[in-house]
Curated annotation (Swiss-Prot):
SUPFAM superfamilies: AbrB/MazE/MraZ-like
Domain of life: Bacteria
A Gene Ontology BP annotation from the UniProt entry: negative regulation of DNA-templated transcription initiation
GO MF term set: DNA-binding transcription factor activity; transcription cis-regulatory region binding
Residue spans crossing the bilayer: none
Domain annotation SpoVT-AbrB: ranges: 5-47, 76-119
Protein name (Swiss-Prot/TrEMBL): Transcriptional regulator MraZ
Entry-linked Pfam families: MraZ (PF02381)
Annotated disulfide bonds: none
Cytoplasm listed as a keyword: yes
GO CC annotations on file: cytoplasm; nucleoid
Compartment(s): Cytoplasm, Nucleoid
Subunit structure as annotated in this protein's UniProt entry: Forms oligomers.
């Protein structure tokens, strides 16, 4: 389970330390790919395989399906953590997410996202603006 928000440095080679609390869940490997809103998404290999099966089963005749498959699969990087618990984010993915020398890693339960700090602040502002909508969603769940 991925929970919490962490700010980490990206070194000159593009390596990013994964939070220690996340590392056990990534012992079998991690897949990093383009996310929504110009962030990156990280998945444990097993969760990625489940998602890939479901997305691959969608009808290829649909333009939306093809675009989703391109977004997820063409930019995906399959990797393992190094001995220091870091991943090497490929240059094309760093450029996509506009990552410099800092990144925010946000846990989202079954996966995590990697954001530029500037974009993450925008996300937090949008969450504040939509708080009443989120309260309604929780009410729909009878929570």
């Amino acid at each position: 389970m991925f929970l919490g928000e962490y700010e980490h440095t990206i070194d000159d080679k593009g390596r990013l330390a994964i939070p220690a609390r996340f590392r056990d869940a990534l012992s079998e490997g991690v897949v990093i790919t383009r996310g929504f809103d110009r962030c990156l998404m990280g998945f444990p290999r097993g969760v990625w395989e489940e998602l890939a099966r479901q997305v691959s089963s969608l009808p290829i005749g649909s333009e939306e399906t093809r675009q989703l498959q391109r977004m997820l699969f063409s930019g995906a990087a399959d990797m393992s953590l190094d001995r220091q618990g870091r991943i090497l984010i490929p240059q094309n993915l760093r450029e996509f997410a506009e990552l410099g020398d800092q990144a925010v890693i946000a846990g989202l339960n079954r996966h995590f996202e990697i954001w530029s700090p500037r974009r993450w602040q925008n996300v937090l502002s949008a969450m504040d603006a939509n708080a009443s909508l989120f309260a309604q969603k929780l009410a729909e769940l009878r929570f």
